[in-house]
């Protein structure tokens, strides 16, 4: 199969807002690829916005200057995958020239449509509105299987591509079960507006836990062998010896547990998230980092213990098993209550301890691997800032033809200008996209046909964010975390926008 077929399907999927049409287009492509398991695996990975190789060391810097496109499609899917694998296996810093040469060779053989697809795939910005459930439904349709069967296999196998390859080759998907040493998709939480909202949605009584601002880890132990996986299922065992040691100290033979790794200050308050995140880098000197930035691990769920699977067990049963195994110093603070006042006090105490909020877990909820269920609800304060839009990018997918991704700036009183602190297209409704496309044409500086449109700094926007982190990407040295648009502020002048000092105060 040609890369052209995948690129055109991706374009078609991005161009429609119909879920049924997206599913049908992807299913048709997968049906053509079956029963070739390698081909199916690659296509499902790519159309999910991922690479089978996961990381190949190619970022935006290597994709800035592309050769002219090829006139006719000739690249095959498996050939491109082999090239990406070769790029990813080049060793050391001295391989940058070789990597750049291979990237240039690949793109020179790609048509314009193929270049666009590869550029977005490698840049992590496929944006075709076909992740998660849509991809699973497409696999199910192509394989003639119930969607629930495909979803469960993907959750327990930790990989939709593997489940797709099995299903489309005629293999039984009931072989995908929880297996120690094979990571599964983590359960994710929906959002509650308050502890009172969480109590109501969980029937009046729920289990509140401290929500730590660390790094999610999935811990597997088989006898004296421990493997640690991230939320994205990357193996980081070698980087987290503290987690390995804490796991080996538990009186258990086989274990699958869910937890959080976090760097703490001497007074046990959490370090900034980036301190924890720095321990997960591929080039980190683990021994040196451990000496200066040690990690602690907190277990908050247990999915398997010594031959017994607990995925179908209610939260209360899983937590009882956890408490019987893990000492209190390695568990998160917890409160079971039906009293909104007690819940609010627990949230306040958790925030005062430096944590980011609380999780509410329904007592009877099962562990929904790889799914965002109402059985878990996160409650945390939301920060907002009034910032100025400095530039905007043309959208893709359902946002094609709209000015979408906005560049956000904070006011700098020292210079009278604005300092860029992030970008976002989150939170925008269709009506908002229509409005801002018209508005930004009115305040554009220079041409509007390029990918990025520069603007006069006149439009104030209110954004919600989860916090601020250090970043070398922006001039102010800071970047917003999970910024999303709340509303545009026609009532505010740019001189009333929040300052860069206000942004720093959230760090």
Swiss-Prot record:
InterPro entries: ATP-dep_DNA_ligase (IPR050191), DNA_ligae_ATP-dep_bac/arc (IPR022865), DNA_ligase_ATP-dep (IPR000977), DNA_ligase_ATP-dep_C (IPR012309), DNA_ligase_ATP-dep_cent (IPR012310), DNA_ligase_ATP-dep_CS (IPR016059), DNA_ligase_ATP-dep_N (IPR012308), DNA_ligase_N_sf (IPR036599). GO terms for molecular function: ATP binding; DNA binding; DNA ligase (ATP) activity; magnesium ion binding. Disruption phenotype: Not essential for growth. ATP binds at residues 209, 216, 231, 260, 300, 372, 378. It catalyses: ATP + (deoxyribonucleotide)n-3'-hydroxyl + 5'-phospho-(deoxyribonucleotide)m = (deoxyribonucleotide)n+m + AMP + diphosphate. Its EC number is 6.5.1.1. Residues 1-172 are annotated as: Not required for adenylyltransferase activity, required for nick joining. The active site is at residue 211. One of its GO terms (cellular component) is peptidoglycan-based cell wall. GO terms for biological process: cell division; DNA biosynthetic process; DNA recombination; DNA repair; DNA replication. Its cofactor is Mg(2+). It holds the Pfam family DNA_ligase_A_M. It comes from the Bacteria. Keywords: ATP-binding, Cell cycle, Cell division, DNA damage, DNA recombination, DNA repair, DNA replication, Ligase, Magnesium, Metal-binding, Nucleotide-binding. DNA ligase that seals nicks in double-stranded DNA during DNA replication, DNA recombination and DNA repair. Belongs to the ATP-dependent DNA ligase family. Monomer. PANTHER family: DNA LIGASE 1/3 FAMILY MEMBER, DNA LIGASE-RELATED. This is DNA ligase B. It comes from Mycobacterium tuberculosis (strain ATCC 25618 / H37Rv).
């Amino acid at each position: 199969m040609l890369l052209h077929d995948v690129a055109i399907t991706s374009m078609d999927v991005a161009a429609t807002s119909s879920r049924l049409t997206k599913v049908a287009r992807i299913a048709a492509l997968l049906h053509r690829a079956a029963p070739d398991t390698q081909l199916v695996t690659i296509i499902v990975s790519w159309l999910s916005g991922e690479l089978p190789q996961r990381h190949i060391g190619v970022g935006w810097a290597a994709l800035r200057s592309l050769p002219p496109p090829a006139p006719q499609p000739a690249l095959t899917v498996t050939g491109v995958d082999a090239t990406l694998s070769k790029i990813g296996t080049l060793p050391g810093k001295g391989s940058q020239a070789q990597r750049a040469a291979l990237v240039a060779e690949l793109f020179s053989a790609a048509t314009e449509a193929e270049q666009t697809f590869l550029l977005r795939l490698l840049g992590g910005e496929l944006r075709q509105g076909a992740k998660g459930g849509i991809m699973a439904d497409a696999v199910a349709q192509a394989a003639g299987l119930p969607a629930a069967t495909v979803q469960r296999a993907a959750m327990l196998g930790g990989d939709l591509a593997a489940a797709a390859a099995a299903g489309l080759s005629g293999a039984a998907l009931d072989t995908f079960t929880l297996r120690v040493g094979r990571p599964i998709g983590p359960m994710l939480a929906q959002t509650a507006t308050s502890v009172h909202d969480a109590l109501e949605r969980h029937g009046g009584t729920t289990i509140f836990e401290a929500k730590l601002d660390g790094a999610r880890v999935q811990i597997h132990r088989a006898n004296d062998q421990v493997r640690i996986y991230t939320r994205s299922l990357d193996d980081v065992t070698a980087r987290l010896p503290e987690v390995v040691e804490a796991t080996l100290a538990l009186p258990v033979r086989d274990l699958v547990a869910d937890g959080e790794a976090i760097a703490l200050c001497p007074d046990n308050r959490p370090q900034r998230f980036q301190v924890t995140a720095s321990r997960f880098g591929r080039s980190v000197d683990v021994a040196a980092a451990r000496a200066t930035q040690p990690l602690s691990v907190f277990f908050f769920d247990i999915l398997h213990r010594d031959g017994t699977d607990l995925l179908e067990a209610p939260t209360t049963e899983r937590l009882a098993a956890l408490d019987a195994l893990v000492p209190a110093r390695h568990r998160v603070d917890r409160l079971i209550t039906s009293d909104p006042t007690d819940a609010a006090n627990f949230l306040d105490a958790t925030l005062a301890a430096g944590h980011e909020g609380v999780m509410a877990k329904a007592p009877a909820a099962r562990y929904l691997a790889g799914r965002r269920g109402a059985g878990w609800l996160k409650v945390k304060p939301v920060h907002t800032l009034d910032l100025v839009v400095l530039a905007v990018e043309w959208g893709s997918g359902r946002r094609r033809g709209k000015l979408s991704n906005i560049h956000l700036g904070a006011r700098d009183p020292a210079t009278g200008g604005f300092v860029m602190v992030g970008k976002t297209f989150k939170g925008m409704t269709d009506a908002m996209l229509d409005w801002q496309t018209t508005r930004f044409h009115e305040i554009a500086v220079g041409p509007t046909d390029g990918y990025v449109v520069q603007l006069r700094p006149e439009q104030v926007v209110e954004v919600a964010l989860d916090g601020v982190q250090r970043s070398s990407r922006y001039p102010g040295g800071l970047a917003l975390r999970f910024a999303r648009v709340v509303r545009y502020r026609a009532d505010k002048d740019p001189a009333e926008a929040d300052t860069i000092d206000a942004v720093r105060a959230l760090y």
